[in-house]
Amino acid sequence: MAVPARHTSKAKKNKRRTHYKLTAPSVQFDETTGDYSRSHRVSLKGYYKGRKIAKAASAE
């Protein structure tokens, strides 16, 4: 059975984990509605690529 020859220190372990991070969602400005929305998704007002394709979401 494979066993590590040396103990992995806390610093070495934590340096390996520095690449795990959150990425910001891609947000684009919609000129039709004047709002920001995520790309490739319908805006809250029902627009996608400048065209109305769905009813606006109502606040209940």
From Swiss-Prot:
One of its GO terms (biological process) is translation. Keywords: Ribonucleoprotein, Ribosomal protein. Residues 1-21 are annotated as: Disordered. GO terms for cellular component: large ribosomal subunit. GO terms for molecular function: structural constituent of ribosome. Residues 7-20 have a biased composition (Basic residues). It holds the Pfam family Ribosomal_L32p. Belongs to the bacterial ribosomal protein bL32 family. HAMAP family: Ribosomal_bL32. This is Large ribosomal subunit protein bL32. The gene is rpmF.
